[in-house]
Curated annotation (Swiss-Prot):
Function (record text): Located on the platform of the 30S subunit, it bridges several disparate RNA helices of the 16S rRNA. Forms part of the Shine-Dalgarno cleft in the 70S ribosome.
Gene designation: rpsK
Taxonomic source organism: Bradyrhizobium sp. (strain ORS 278)
Protein name, entry field: Small ribosomal subunit protein uS11
Database matches in InterPro entries: Ribosomal_uS11, Ribosomal_uS11_bac-type, Ribosomal_uS11_sf
Keywords: Ribonucleoprotein, Ribosomal protein, RNA-binding, rRNA-binding
Pfam family, one: Ribosomal_S11
GO cellular component: ribonucleoprotein complex; ribosome
């Protein structure tokens, strides 16, 4: 009886025409989350979940593959238009944005929402290579 209740529910297909793509590109990874207008997550992907490990996660190609994966998931829900919010200093920002546009989404706006400290925490030490 309890085993029947523990079964995983299938995600129901929502019909959402427009949403917001949050592209977070750090120095180590790129995550892309597509939400509806209220902020409820519809689909997400990252370079790490696409099988890239280590320093390959931070490449523009890994961000492009993650964007193609998340766009496929979002189009199953009927999404066609996106607002894009880009955050972070990483190298996968532009390639993820280009991959979302190439997947067939009409991008209505692009915003940079990277947080900038007003002299907050002390930064990391300089790398000497």
């Amino acid at each position: 009886m309890a085993k029947e209740a523990a079964r995983v529910r299938r995600r129901e297909r929502k019909n959402i025409a427009s949403g917001v793509a949050h592209v977070n590109s750090s120095f180590n990874n790129t995550t892309i989350t597509i939400t509806d207008a209220q902020g409820n997550t519809i689909a997400w992907s990252s370079a790490g979940t696409m099988g890239f490990k280590g320093s390959r996660k931070s490449t523009p190609y890994a961000a492009q593959v993650a964007a193609e994966d998340v766009s496929k998931k979002a189009q199953e829900h009927g999404m066609r238009t996106l607002e894009v919010e880009v955050a972070g200093p990483g190298s996968g920002r532009e390639s993820a944005l280009r991959a979302l546009q190439a997947a067939g989404f009409t991008v209505t706006s692009i915003r940079d929402v990277t947080t900038i400290p007003h002299n907050g925490c002390r930064p990391r030490k300089r790398r000497r290579v």
